[in-house]
Amino acid sequence: WDQADPFTAERRGERLFGRGTADDKAGVITHAHALRILASLADGELPCSVTVFIEGEEEVGSPSFENFLTTHRDRLASDVIVVADSSNWKVGTPSLTTSLRGVVQVDVRLDMLDHALHSGMYGGPVLDAATAMCRLIASCHDDAGDVAVAGLVSRSQADADFPDYPEADFRADAGILDGVELSGTGDLTARLWTKPSLTLIGMDVTPLELAGNVLTPSCTARLSLRIAPGQDPAAAQEALVAHLEKHVPFGGRLTVTGREAGPAFDGSEVTPASEAAHWALSTAWDTEAVNIGQGGSIPFIATLKETFPGAQVLVTGIEDPDTRAHSENESMHLGELERIVVAEALLLARLSGAIGS
């Protein structure tokens, strides 16, 4: 971090830096200030009934969410649900997120020996578990970098109403080093939003400071599989497990434990609420709003849809390509925060009928 304490917000220019400033403290601020604006215009009264729920478990799969919804179903029932946990296409271009990938997360354990061995005395006829794990994980991608797991939903062309994403812009936004090639095939936005991706997010291996001439007997890795809209999470996990079982190196003993399985989100249907959202965003920014997808996941949206099937779900947010959510130097653009607050106030007013169409 470029500041002493990531949990103390620091303003630099038009951006506010700090852990969680954008993902997702900004969402809480958006709801609070939009309601404050509406209340101030009507002597403390809101033009419509609003329930605010701050969900603090999203990053760990929302294990308590379904039970909470069931317990408080009557209090939380809504015609429209606004989830302020996404992003805009770029600073100055407001966006409504109409597509989110789902997520499947598993722990993969590979055992090769019943105890550690001297790598000089025994290396050669036996692979250590870490090396075998690397071979197993590498089998999950083909030579082009596409996920090679059979049975996964994959769309090589993104939705027609999504904006074009020039490769040069993506490389700059992502901080890709010169000379590093992009992985995968198909439209760039499809690779980000409508095709699966697989990431090694953790691995138990011997740290360098403890390295020795040892054949490691076992190794555990954590894999995160992002799944395309239309993919059943359970079927995706089954496909991943089947692939791993098929490609175990040299007959190692494989154990796969599921950790998380969250469905994707498809909000492409045009509804009165989505039309109102486009109007509110476009008005607040004085620029036409666009539909975008997101490669990330918000699994609890599916839980909301199952619990309240008649509700229209709108996904908005404050992030932009410079936000760096989940990374050091996370930040949000303060001008964008002001505009999303105004947009949400306008949206609620339009939905309540306080502002005509």
Residue spans of the language-model regions?
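Acidic-enriched catalytic cores of C-N bond-cleaving enzymes acting on peptides and small amides
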Residues: 89, 98, 119-203, 231-253
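Zn-dependent metallopeptidase/amidohydrolase metal-coordination segment
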Residues: 16, 109, 133, 203, ...
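Active-site metal-coordination/substrate-binding segment of hydrolases
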Residues: 1-51, 339
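A short beta-alpha structural unit
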Residues: 226-228, 255-270
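Histidine/acidic-residue-rich, glycine-tolerant segments that coordinate divalent metal ions
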Residues: 47-128
